[in-house]
């Protein structure tokens, strides 16, 4: 007998811990889950339950990620924590765990370290919109001035990467004390303050169904007597029969009208985010549409060829290249449903990129693709994945 239906009455938000190795990300993750479970229900987690993160695959890349859930009075959170630095890089670039906000953990005893900076930069590049800071290990620092200094350094670092340093909530505490059940200011109280900061500082994300209509084209059929049907999975928004849509990417943008929505051989009056549908397009010929284009609300997304991106290059062990690549390397870029050839320009100080590296690059595609900042892609050579990336900034 089922124990009743899962009621999701609270809005859902995805978060994750970022920060330097050994600054206390996993301890904090355990502390949040444990403290909040006593207040709002949910499951307490021990450190080693989170640290033994299972492997998962995203875009052919193996990533170790721990998933923890917890609730506050207002929200349900899904929280990701990664054991190793390389896992963070892969996770953020592939979007395996898309974050609505990140919790930056920084040790008060050490201050910002190289990975603190690198994770903030990655968060900026991959479009993590909000960061909340937990200044950890405050029980090891007696000097108030030292705490203020570390706090100031963190705010400056956030500013440097275009996060609002002055407005960012910084909570002081000790994840270790909280996990041990300490009820003091640095223990449980700090975790409750952090939970409040997450609730108030990170806005509730827009649900996919509330977005502007977008559907990547997977297949195109000609049905005699009815016209052209385009199939795919609606990525966001809603499409209603009779609405005007645009076909964007690869060639010149065209306008058409959706005259029918089909799902499982039934006619519907609309399709929405998550649905696998066939859309009947008025006056559109079979050869006017191809896989790799998108159908969208007119004016909502534009085709582009020139952009900067943050990419992770697969190591040899992950089935990637065995050799480095150099400036002007020309692989295929797999966006949504299709490959497009493009040329890579490396930063001036980078002569080559080794398998296992992550790097900021500039790309020029030979055909335009419907593109927005934050769009994920794979880098492929002859059909096998050699890298993963995310569009950081559109140039043209």
Curated annotation (Swiss-Prot):
Entries under Pfam families matching the protein: GTP_EFTU (PF00009), GTP_EFTU_D2 (PF03144), GTP_EFTU_D3 (PF03143)
Catalytic activity: GTP + H2O = GDP + phosphate + H(+)
Region G3: start-end pairs: 81-84
Binding residues for GTP: 19-26, 81-85, 136-139
Region of interest called G1, as start-end residue ranges on this chain: 19-26
PROSITE patterns tied to this protein: G_TR_1, G_TR_2
Region feature (G4): 136-139
Region annotated G5, chain positions: 174-176
Chain sites annotated for binding Mg(2+): 26
Any one GO CC term of the record: cytosol
GO molecular function: GTP binding; GTPase activity; guanosine tetraphosphate binding; translation elongation factor activity
Superkingdom field: Bacteria
Known partners and oligomeric status: Monomer.
Function: GTP hydrolase that promotes the GTP-dependent binding of aminoacyl-tRNA to the A-site of ribosomes during protein biosynthesis.
NCBIfam families referenced in this protein's UniProt entry, alphabetically: EF-Tu, PRK00049.1, PRK12735.1, PRK12736.1, small_GTP
Protein name listed in UniProt: Elongation factor Tu
Originating species: Verminephrobacter eiseniae (strain EF01-2)
């Amino acid at each position: 007998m089922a124990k009743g239906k899962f009621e999701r009455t609270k809005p859902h938000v995805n978060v994750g811990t970022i920060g330097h190795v050994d600054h206390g990300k996993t301890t904090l993750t355990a502390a949040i889950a444990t403290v909040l479970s006593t207040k709002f229900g949910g499951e307490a987690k021990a450190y080693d339950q989170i640290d033994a993160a299972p492997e998962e695959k995203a875009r052919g890349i193996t990533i170790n990620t721990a998933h923890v859930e917890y609730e506050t009075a207002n929200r349900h959170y899904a929280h990701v924590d990664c054991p190793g630095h390389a896992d963070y890089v892969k996770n953020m670039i592939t979007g395996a765990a898309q974050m609505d906000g990140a919790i930056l953990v920084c040790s008060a005893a050490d201050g910002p370290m190289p990975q603190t900076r690198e994770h903030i930069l990655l968060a900026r590049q991959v479009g993590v919109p909000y960061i909340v800071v937990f200044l950890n290990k405050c029980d090891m620092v007696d000097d108030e001035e030292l705490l203020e200094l570390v706090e100031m350094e963190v705010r400056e670092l956030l500013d440097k990467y275009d996060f609002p340093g002055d407005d960012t909530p910084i909570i002081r505490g000790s994840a270790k004390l909280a996990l041990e059940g300490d009820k003091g200011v640095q223990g449980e109280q700090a975790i409750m303050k952090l939970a409040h900061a997450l609730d108030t500082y990170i806005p509730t994300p827009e649900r996919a169904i509330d977005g502007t209509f977008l559907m990547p084209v997977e297949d195109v059929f000609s049905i005699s007597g009815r016209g052209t049907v385009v199939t795919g999975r609606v990525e966001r928004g809603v499409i209603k029969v009779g609405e005007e849509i645009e076909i964007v990417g690869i060639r010149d943008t065209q306008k058409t009208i959706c005259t029918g929505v089909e799902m499982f051989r039934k006619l519907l009056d609309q399709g929405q985010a998550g649905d696998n549908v066939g859309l009947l397009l008025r006056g559109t010929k079979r050869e006017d549409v191809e896989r790799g284009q998108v159908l969208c609300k007119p004016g909502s997304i534009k085709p582009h060829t020139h952009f900067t991106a943050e990419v992770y290059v697969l190591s040899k062990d992950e089935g990637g290249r065995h050799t480095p690549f150099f400036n002007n390397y020309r692989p295929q870029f797999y966006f949504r449903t299709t490959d497009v050839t493009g040329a890579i320009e490396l930063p001036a100080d980078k002569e080559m990129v080794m398998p296992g590296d992550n790097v900021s690059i500039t790309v020029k595609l030979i055909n335009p693709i419907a593109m927005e900042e934050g769009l994920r892609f794979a880098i492929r050579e002859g059909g096998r994945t050699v890298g993963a990336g995310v569009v950081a900034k559109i140039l043209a």
